[in-house]
Amino acid sequence: MHQQAATSSRCQGWSPRYQGWSPRFQGWSPRFHGWNPRFRGWNPHCRGWSPCFQGWSPRCQTFPPKINRISSNYPTCDGQEQPAYFTDNFCKPCGVVLQHESERISHFESEIHAQNVKFFFQMHGEQSEVPGRKVNMHAGNSQVCSSGEVNRNNFTDLHNMSFDSLAAAPSHYVGKSHSPTQNQSLEEHDQVSPSTCSPKMDEPNTTPAPPPFLKSVIVKPPPAYRMRTYVCHICSITFTSLHMFRSHMQGTEHQIKRAQHLWTHWQCTQLLESHVINQVKNSKKMQESCQAECGDDIKMKKSRELEPKGHFREMEDNYMEAQAHEYREMVDSRPRHKMLEQTLPLENFWAHPGPYNDSRALEEQLPHNLPAESKTYDSFQDELEDYIKGQKARGLDPNTSFRRMSESYRYRDQRYRERVDSEHRQRPCEERFSFEAPQTYQQEYSASPVEGQSPHWLPSHSKRRNDDFQNEFDDYNKVQESRESEPKTSFRRMDSSFETHNYEEMVDRRSSHTMFEEGLPCETFQTYTDPYSSAQAVENTLPHCLPAYENQPSLDAESHYQLTTEEFSEMPASLSLSQQEDNPSSYNVDYDIYKHLPSNDNASAHETSHRRRRQKRKRHLEEGKERPEKEQSKHKRKRSYQDKDLDKDKLIKQSKREEDKAGVSSEKTKHRRKKRKHETSSEKEERKHKKEKKKSVEERTEEEILWDESILGF
């Protein structure tokens, strides 16, 4: 047998070329799909163990020794048989159900099954010996020495190989397949604990040694239980063998992806560095800007002769001291402001209300932790009493009404302007009067509540707070009655043309009244107080932005009187008979006016009468122009009416013939005619109104337009 094994070593897979196992068969014979029956292999014909060849049959659940197959029918060392781990339909170590014979053969010949079986028996501590197989214990060529060590010349544990010749063992150890597997086994041996790697040598080995195809130095679990993996994180690929992992690391795809990964990593680092550099630069700029702002603030404080505050901690420490200092300055300035208020007139004080309001605002903005203002009050009444006492102690009037001051200021300003205007008008009037009877006029003006008020020269009603419109309206009526002028009860807006017309009449009456006043004594002036009061009331309604033209009405009136007299002298002395017949009432009215007026006021009477005559003449001339137009329109209407009557007769005749058909049409035509009549009449009326408006606009002369522009501003 040994000679046959030596001569036919090729059938075991050993190749002289590769100095080891053939890569094709790895120890298997291509003819019998397993071991050669002549060289301790498998018998393809016999089921089970063949007595001739001392091997397993591939049909009867026999397994090749290369992948560590174990039969289920071999006895243990005690002579007792193990339970059937492997049946025709089930594999217990792998947990697989096998239904067909082809499945059983392919499963039992697989490497996964061999590893699972090996791990299964090693975990349970079960070792067995092939029946009928005896190990020779010779010293020269025995597999196991007396000391228990394995002879490397006859058997290798890494590949589970047995050598029949002495020359085959060194050629195998020097070959390429043994060294990488040995390195891998050493790496895995370092990871496993020594208790599981080497058996205990102190205890005697009662069981016989296992066959060479079942021995292993390192306990390695199968892939089903544990599998060593190698991962490439760049390419995200896993490998089960170290050789494939190393070949992948040296490949071109891995190198390209690695270069891309390094490039992206370098870009990220560059971006981070640039971001950090920009942040540092911005922080430096912010520091410089803050320092510049602090320097500007310190310079400004020095220019204002204040202590510069460069640090925020010092500002926080000195905040209370600065607030207290401002409060003291405000308290010291308030009595001085009170003295100025009493000495200066009210108009100047109201024009500059800033310091007092600023001091009050500062007092309100002060913190409440000052010693003078740190009191707590149980009710509002106590706080109000304390406030009144403090104001009286400072020499100020306590403000007990907490309404908004803007409304009261507006009301005071309006009343004060009215008072000043009335005062300016009364003084020149008093200078014109003679001193023969001054008592009557002193009583008249002393009755008015404008003068003699304290301390701001305002009437008592201006100090009230008008809570609603009714109280304000009552006060207004009282003031107007005290001034002997009719109160204005209608507050609707009037047209601009009407206002300008009233103002022109008012100015004319004032100029005539002043001339009449200079000629008459003071006793007769009392009978003509109504025009003066009405002119004064109207002038109060005018805006106060015309001070430059208040001193020129007398000069403008005299120049206007001279121009009108020249025009009057140039006008024709007599009118035509038709015009005199048309307007006899106008001359009668003018004659009555001359009768009632005295001889000293002839100039003003001529002026007013001349204006009225001129306006009436223009109206009559325009009416004379309109008369032929009206007559023509009347003739046209008569003709249209005659034509319409003829049309009506025709329509009546046609309606008698066709009553049923033309009844509706006749009614429609009647309605259309009525609409046409109304439309023609409305158009004529609109034309008349437009002409009248144009004439009223053209009536104003250039002098009146200049007068309006100079006095009224439009």
UniProtKB/Swiss-Prot annotation:
Q: Where in the cell is it found?
A: Nucleus
**Recorded superkingdom:** Eukaryota
ZnF Matrin-type residues are 89-119, 230-254
Q: Which residues fall in a compositionally biased region of kind Basic residues?
A: 609-619, 669-678
Offer one Pfam family short name for this entry: zf-met
Q: Which InterPro entries match?
A: Matrin/U1-like-C_Znf_C2H2, Znf_C2H2_sf, Znf_C2H2_type
GO CC annotation: what is one?
Answer: nucleus
Chain positions covered by the region annotation Disordered? 172-214, 417-469, 571-714
* Stretches with biased composition (Basic and acidic residues): 417-434, 620-632, 640-662
List the Gene Ontology MF annotations in alphabetical order.
Answer: DNA binding; zinc ion binding
Keywords in alphabetical order: DNA-binding, Metal-binding, Nucleus, Repeat, Zinc, Zinc-finger
SMART domains linked: ZnF_C2H2 (SM00355), ZnF_U1 (SM00451)
Q: Which residues form the signal peptide?
A: none
Question: Which portions of the chain have biased composition (kind: Polar residues)?
Answer: 437-446, 575-588
The entry's protein name is Zinc finger matrin-type protein 1
